[in-house]
Amino acid sequence: IIQPHIHKKKLRKIYDTNECLFILKGSMRVDFFNNKKKYITSRVLKKNYIILLLSGGHGFKILKNCQFLEVKQGPYMLEKDKERFNFEKK
């Protein structure tokens, strides 16, 4: 049991954007990179998988008719919060 509660208001400084994805159907590949944009590894996410992305870089490739829910903490300023880079998996 989790006792009923509220979350107290507190001004917070956010230095990173964290995101969580829940795969509703289909599948996707996620490519992982370190903070210097160097490729580390890839994993396939399928229906009902959940992933929490906390640091480093990542990219996605839809493999099979994928639908997913993505949640990020805010405020999120789209292009001001994202640095894109090129990568092609061999």
Locations of regions flagged by a protein language model:
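A short beta-loop-beta micro-motif enriched in histidine and acidic residues
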Residues: H5-C20
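Histidine-centered metal-chelating micro-motifs
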Residues: I2-Q3, K9-K10, N48-G59, Y76
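Short acidic-glycine-tyrosine-enriched beta hairpin
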Residues: N34-S55
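Double-stranded beta-helix
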Residues: G59-K90
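Glycine- and acidic-residue-biased ligand/ion/polar-headgroup-sensing regions
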Residues: D16-N34
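Short beta-strand His + acidic residue motifs that chelate non-heme Fe in jelly-roll/DSBH
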Residues: P4, V30-D31, L52-L53, H58-L63, ...
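Short, charged/polar surface micro-motifs in flexible loops or helix N-caps
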Residues: I1-Q3, K25-R29, G74
